[in-house]
Design a protein with these regions (language model features):
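N-terminal glycine-rich phosphate/adenylate-binding segment common to multiple enzyme folds
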Residues: 62, 68-139
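A short, charged/proline- and glycine-enriched loop
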Residues: 8-18
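Short, small-residue-biased leader/transition segments that mark boundaries at the very start
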Residues: 3-4
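Short glycine-rich or small-residue beta-strand-to-loop segments that form or flank ligand, phosphate
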Residues: 16-22, 61, 91-92
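Cap/lid and interdomain-hinge subdomains that line or gate substrate/regulatory clefts
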Residues: 114-172
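Short connector loops at secondary-structure junctions
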Residues: 42-66, 137-144
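Short acidic, glycine/serine/threonine-rich loops at helix termini
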Residues: 30-32, 56-61, 99-108, 145-154
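Short, glycine-/Ser/Thr-/acidic-enriched flexible segments
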Residues: 23-26, 51, 94-96, 139-141
Length: 172
């Protein structure tokens, strides 16, 4: 409770709202991402829970009939974030995540899930269509230090945020 509030209130407010789509494996890591962005002073907007209407609204952008339903639904979530007037949409491709069992093994994700942010960038093109930057960095997270190092680089290049601030946010 209090520790989290204090930490956020001490943070510089950036007046940038980051849209996070409530989709695919990205949803499983949402607690990390919401804490990460908020502790760096960003506002967060998560897309609404999935509905059939949301699915239908995104269908025009679906490039393949054979792609799975959860992937098709992503297009509707992107449109939902556009309606919520976010400043940027963040949907990383995370190529590998460390296994909970041992340090030496990694579990790989479904290729569609892994590559879907690139599909969104090309088919929906949020920047071109709605003027909303669509950030889809590719992360290779085999070990905890990969996560920290790659996020430090991404935040420094994208938002000019100091490595020490990003490091604190990763651990928040």
């Amino acid at each position: 409770g209090d520790v989290y509030k204090r930490q956020v209130s001490d943070t510089v407010r950036r007046n940038i709202t980051i849209g996070l789509p409530r989709v695919l494996a990205f949803w499983d890591t949402m607690p990390f991402w919401t804490t990460f962005w908020r502790s760096l002073g960003f506002e967060i907007q998560i897309s609404s829970p999935s509905t059939h209407k949301m699915f239908e609204e995104g269908l025009s952008a679906v490039t393949s009939d054979t792609v799975c339903f959860p992937a098709k639904l992503v297009h509707g979530h992107i449109r939902d974030l556009v309606k919520k007037k976010v400043d940027r949409i963040f949907m990383p491709s995370i190529a590998a995540i460390g296994s909970e069992n041992t340090e030496s093994t990694s579990e790989s994700m479904c290729a569609v899930v892994k590559g879907y942010p690139l599909v969104i960038r090309n088919s929906d093109s949020p920047e071109k269509q709605w003027g909303i930057p669509f950030d889809a960095p590719l992360f290779y997270w085999y070990r905890e230090e990969d996560k920290e190092r790659q996020l430090i680089t991404y935040m420094e290049q994208t938002f000019s945020i100091q490595p020490s601030e990003t490091k604190k946010a990763v651990l928040a």
